[in-house]
């Protein structure tokens, strides 16, 4: 049986330093990690950056079969107003804004950006699933 959690999210990227610089421009700090891997410790998880070709080699698939950007990562904010601020910071760091901050049918507020290596990020405020004081998210619906 598998516990209901995700410990590490690994993004296959073309240029590790460029990808790391993007997240550092958003205020994230690198964690100590071995050569060939860049990690950012998150609250109860880690975001890892790994060379796309190395990831393909590791799983035994050609890069063309890995897919890229087919998953949306979500960053939840404490306030509705913070959504636009995070989107602006992402754009200033080199992201492409795909959807400006807007109210959502379920009562929240969100927008989307694409990171320089193609990953899709949602920035969202969910008034029904408030973040803990430490920033941890727990789904309480909408």
Model-found features: residue ranges?
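Vicinal oxygen chelate
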Residues: 1-8, 26-114, 125-142
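Long, hydrophobic N-terminal alpha-helical segment
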Residues: 12-13, 18
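Conserved active-site tyrosine of GNAT-family acetyltransferases
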Residues: 19-24, 90, 118
